């Protein structure tokens, strides 16, 4: 019987795990190991993928992949039960390294005072790692509750300790190189060799998190464990025997709450202490010499002796290298530069281990780790029957991931987000800001007139800077409002559910459910959308997602939509904007289907993802994100757009002999724009001023509006040079043509110059074709 045959609320024990290579290793790392007990919670609304409860957390799995896992049915397993027992009275927590308990001062060899203490901040996705980074460094960084929020390494010094450098690494589940994020983290630790590791462990899901911890301990680097979210554990009636956990793991364990700023000072003290004195983990061997793990123990130790010289030469910690060689990690084996004879000996050693253990080598290593983790949890973790957050999540999921309610809920939520952004909150705030900018402009205009400032300077300030930059600034409330709602959806954990719900739909166009998140982020800004695609383990899925993300209309295009819909489609402005967003999505789907059947043939990778509990979005996190986005927008408004505005003003104010013109049609700009204007004549907007605005939009989409504001004299002139039959094709062209230079740069960074050029040319061509189709429909 396979896992795919299991029915809802039925439980099973895994007998064997199929698949091969990195995919199978990923299954094992996620806890799908022989002997593990699981329960089928539900199916996605489309009947695929499924949601499993295993090791106390929810995991998604497609039916095609579930068919590779052999099971046997068992009686019902407890949903979130850990080791249920009454906690003892409060026990003091002296901790490793404190009071000389584990620190021998006679043998200490502290690092020089002037040496920078470098730390790697490592942990699973959704463990609160980025929030911890903000606490430790004071840095402002986006915090979300979807797997893979951190897509780049972020550096900062610990507050109050200038001689430190802490790096926030991507959230990962193991040190196996399945996704690019896991590879980034592993390569950073192995190559850059931080002097200390701060491992963030979610205290409400210790069993899941300790799998990575065990591999980090094998690296023989000074390390502390931050047991995060302890406030939630206590609220649920749970507890952790910290001292016993320290003894079993051999490193300091500090109970903390990054969200409530509890235990942070103690964590910093421990981290700096163990790193300063190079106190490596006391334990790296987790398999018993006897019993079921005896064969694994003998195998790893035999390999350690065999590869010792190679590991030293490659500067890879020997225990870590041996474990990875034992489980068949090809990248580590390659780095060790073993000869054929040594490889044959390793094959014999692992074959003997498989024969004695009754499991293949990868499953045996994973099973050994989970056995030790179970032992740690049995002796140290006191769990309540079910956490409040899990109960709340189950109730919410009945609606948001329900068979008949999930898709309508998604449409309703996104529709509400756009309605509030464009018609209620954002629009009203925009009106207030516009009034303020107009009053300030009139005030400055009066001052410049009364002081007799040179007419050229006067024109530059009022007609150039105030008109151009001011017009873009007025759209800040709409952009911030959209980011506000998107960040709440992401921070709450809803985005992970959207991926779960939409997986089967996206698979029809050749993508994975995980691809929905970069594309949804793309509605805010294409750049982070492209960057967040690094969470996708498949190169094929990643490339397709990056190429499709620009079709999701970014917030920088909002000023264009608002300007033209308010002028030409006032009664139906909201409807037209919603149709534009839908049009971008449908075009992306069409392009995806074409790519799926041509350049990107093949199937998307398995959808194996943890579903985090819903959490109330932290308002501080949301406000920090909004401030970052507002700051970024303002920086662009006063740099790229400011410079573009001045350049546009100069080009449209002077002729080629730098004489001031009375009519802008005689300007340098008119001559330059005239070259490309004929291209847009069939689309209904063959005017040099509009052509110029579209050109500057390549720098930043907000520049389209600011450029037009400089070139035309009020909205009446726009109405004179455009008709509704030309305005709608123009909106479609703006929706689909090349993304801004920052987005192109991020695409180049991820995929190379060839794909970046392809996006520019391809999207301009698609935009022209779609705008032409709309033009033909409008004039029929």
Predicted features along the sequence, with ranges:
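Juxtamembrane inter-helical linkers in multi-pass membrane proteins
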Residues: 435, 439-443, 496-526, 601-625, ...
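Conserved G1/Walker A P-loop phosphate-binding module
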Residues: 93-174
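Extended, low-charge hydrophobic alpha-helical regions
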Residues: 363-364, 383, 424-465, 509, ...
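Extended helical scaffolds that flank P-loop GTPase cores
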Residues: 277, 283-453, 660-669
